[in-house]
Amino acid sequence: MKPDHPLSGAVVLLFAVACGLAVGNVYYAQPLLDAMAEAFAMDPATIGIIITLTQIGYGVGLLLLVPLGDLLNRRRLIVLQTLLSALALLMIALAPSSTWLLLGMALTGLLAVVTQVLVAYAATLAIPAQHGRVVGVITSGIVVGILLARTVAGGMADLAGWRSIYLLSAGLTLVMALLLFRVLPRHEDARPDSAYGALIGSVFTLFKEEPVLRQRAILALLTFASAMVLWTPLVLPLSAPPLSLSHTEIGLFGLAGAAGALAAARAGHLADRGLGQWTSGLSLLLMLASWLPIALTQSSLWALLLGVITLDLGLQAVHVTSQSMIYSVRPEAQSRLTAGYMLFYSIGSALGSIGSTAMYAWGGWIAVCWLGAGISAVALIYWWLTLAAKTPNTCGKPPRHSYRQSPRLIHGPCPATCCPAPHRGAPNRETTPPPGAAARSGTIDTPDTYVPCAGMQTPAYSPAGSTAVATSC
């Protein structure tokens, strides 16, 4: 059942708050790593294992739990996962040993994937024209939840110890479960006629079938690895001499990141206008540039502030754009697309967490910054390579060519003989051929080329007078 009216602002806001609260549970530990290490006599050089196990749990949840959103009633699944999250948080708050702490962290990560079920559910409920805006608002809620989690956790730790934030979050999560049960729209969509195992396998099938998902998933791995290289070990230089900041002061840097994340919300609008690729490129460049001021952390906290804002602005702009792009690919598989994409996000976060603390133990803060900058550079290069690669066109959308001409455009339906089933009848633009070139059925448009659709082996016209290769519609 397709939505026939847009989601209200209040419901979108509830989705955003619920996502922010759920994902914040994963990040409370970041400014508290030194306190946890002291409480359980853990080596500070390996304390990153707490974040890594949480991200591993998150990755397992993405693979095993998120696809259930395409099989089961999403509303009930969301409420159940939220209730179980409250129990996992209580386990952390009452942990008597590091073993129970790590188990609670892994379970918290596993159940925090309710965030992605919420995102996919919101995308299903939204009308196509508001996909980018809805995803942008909810993603901003997620990011603000991540960043404010650090701030609130730091303040609570100074006031009442590191366990207090988990007790508070358990109570808030329980209240949110009740709100979601009362407010979430009752929406039933067609369910795939497949078993759970086949559904999980279809996540990997989507990677084979959808190049956009593959490209954006790898970008997610690299960008979130770079971000976690900053956030995981940041507490170590800030809490040590000569800075010796308190947990509250360390957590305040999360507010700086929140400012950058909120500014990235507009990336969804740009993606809706077809500017997703170039938004991604500019954002990746910002991420790379951010490591220069971050490297000056121990001599200037203002430089760190600038770097944090820039890094999170770039990170979230890429993230919002990627989600908007992949959700447009296969509307009937929103949860599985989310699972596949966010699985790479989780892998990148886990690798960045464990790698950054190891680099800090080996070479200090400068080594951490070199690692983060290197990963950001790889992400930028990868984006450029995928942009330069020649990819098939999609029905009704111009390919990625330079706009050297402004040809006359004829607007009409995309021919059924050309388009895949999901796109038949979709609006299309056809470039008018020059005088003497007969119009051929099934053409697609480009700004400077007149070409037939895939499977139609007829000559094509191009401004240079050459024969264009048939392109898939």
Predicted regions, residues:
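Juxtamembrane intracellular "pre-TM" segments in multi-pass secondary transporters
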Residues: 2-5, 185-217, 403
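Structural signature of the two symmetry-related core transmembrane helices
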Residues: 76-90, 170, 278-293, 373
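Cytoplasmic helix-loop-helix junction between adjacent transmembrane helices
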Residues: 104-141
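Intracellular juxtamembrane helix-capping segments at the cytosolic ends
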Residues: 114-126, 317-330
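C-terminal transmembrane helical hairpin of 12-TM major facilitator-type secondary transporters
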Residues: 277-322
